[in-house]
């Protein structure tokens, strides 16, 4: 899979931009605060209908305007797709091949992406919510039903929490009705996550072993707030534990267990990776990203698009080399950087773009080499 071109209207500091890409490597060079990250964010947004930097769509709108449009042409093994996202004060519209998509799960997955940004280094030591977000984005791209189940779960969870917060005399019969719905959706969310972690664990360990020069093994554990013995019993255990938590939940006025409380833990040679060195943690994240690429390819039969946002300067020469070696020739890759100094040997099939104050131009020197 690769994105052939993109058109931006009123996105961040871009009033208008139209860019044609190389199917292989695309490098965007410019000083800081010129729009390099904004541009990669637009590709990410076109794929996932969300930013990795903000929850507010208003922040994406150019200060002179009130609406945004991002369009792109994607080439997949199954054919060409036209993607279109429009944001306005009335809301958002998503289209595939000019047809409106009623549900998010109908749109997500049309173009798959893997993003590696400096903030990903917080995946090891950061808040559990970062790791849940990591799971939700990856699983959502390869399992469209997951997003619907997660949305339904969050809807019932909000109902349950609102009821607990606003009701003085809680009706446990009504609470049990909500428990049934929460267990239905939540057990499927946990099952999807559990399966994904098992597959990710195997693939990431292969990469980490190579990157660490065969000195370290990586393992990933899913930490569920629900105790269960096997996948077939998740719903039953979830429901029982929800019932047992009624008194605590009524007292605290929120739902104390469920996938919204779950986490993942990383281990390097059986030691919690939070105690690892910065270099070990960077190798871990690099292994995760390379594993994501392979998992998406396995499920969808198409390689995802790789977005590397200002991370090459965060990696030493060894890890840069392993990253570039790990990227298959048919993985379209986008790199942002302030210079080419810290990039290892580059392939011939690439395009280099200059980015300056919301304007993108082809690097003519490279184009004529």
UniProtKB/Swiss-Prot annotation:
GO terms for biological process: DNA replication; DNA synthesis involved in DNA repair; double-strand break repair; SOS response. HAMAP family: RecF. Its main location: cytoplasm. NCBIfam families: recf. Transmembrane segments: none annotated. One of its GO terms (cellular component) is cytoplasm. InterPro entries: DNA-binding_RecF, DNA-binding_RecF_CS, P-loop_NTPase, RecF/RecN/SMC_N, RecF_2. Belongs to the RecF family. GO terms for molecular function: ATP binding; single-stranded DNA binding. It comes from the Bacteria. PROSITE patterns: RECF_1, RECF_2. The keyword Hydrolase does not apply. SUPFAM superfamilies: P-loop containing nucleoside triphosphate hydrolases (SSF52540). Keywords: ATP-binding, Cytoplasm, DNA damage, DNA repair, DNA replication, DNA-binding, Nucleotide-binding, SOS response. The RecF protein is involved in DNA metabolism; it is required for DNA replication and normal SOS inducibility. RecF binds preferentially to single-stranded, linear DNA. It also seems to bind ATP. This is DNA replication and repair protein RecF. The gene is recF. It is found in: Cytoplasm. ATP binds at residues 30-37.
